[in-house]
Design a protein with these regions (language model features):
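N-terminal beta-strand motif that seeds the catalytic metal site of vicinal oxygen chelate
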Residues: 1-31, 36, 85-88, 140-142
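Short amphipathic beta-strand starts and helix->beta connectors
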Residues: 2-5, 68-75
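DNA polymerase sliding clamps and clamp-related checkpoint/processivity subunits
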Residues: 65-66, 79
Length: 142
């Protein structure tokens, strides 16, 4: 096992798990997790065609496509696999540097975005590396 370094791109923690859910299953799925104690904030990301239910503190995110046209990564995932774990989000100090590390292991970048405003910055890069669905997240949010 290789020793970790203090190079940029270092992981700081597993941040949260993302489940892809069919639109018609979202209310019941959210209710189930709510009864377990999760508290979701709903975010409509029209620019990427997603409805997101996020419990940032609880470490859980539910995503479903907004449209019925079947386009987008989440819709394609659901068509191929049905509902399930879409990604495990790894918090890193520098998402771009972590992506470079992953590229040395043959990663494939599927999506990346930068969001900011209202006092926050967030960089997110979805990758597949060594067969694992991961998202690299660097942010100044807690």
């Amino acid at each position: 096992v290789a020793e970790s370094t203090n190079e940029p791109g270092r992981a700081t923690s597993v941040h949260h798990v993302v489940f892809a859910v069919m639109a018609e299953q979202l209310p019941e799925t959210a209710q189930f997790f709510s009864e377990l104690g999760f508290r979701f904030q709903t975010i409509e990301l029209e620019d990427v065609g997603l409805r997101v239910l996020l419990d940032w503190d609880g470490g859980l995110e539910l995503v479903t496509p907004l449209g019925a046209d079947g386009s987008g990564e989440v819709a394609q995932f659901l068509q191929r696999n049905g509902p399930g774990v879409y990604s495990v989000v790894i918090r890193v100090d520098d998402a771009q540097a972590a992506e470079q590390v992953a590229q040395r292991y043959g990663s494939r970048t599927q999506f990346q975005q930068h969001r900011g405003g209202d006092g926050f910055e967030l960089d997110e890069i979805e990758i597949s590396v060594l067969g694992l669905p991961l998202t690299l997240l660097s942010t100044d949010l807690p």
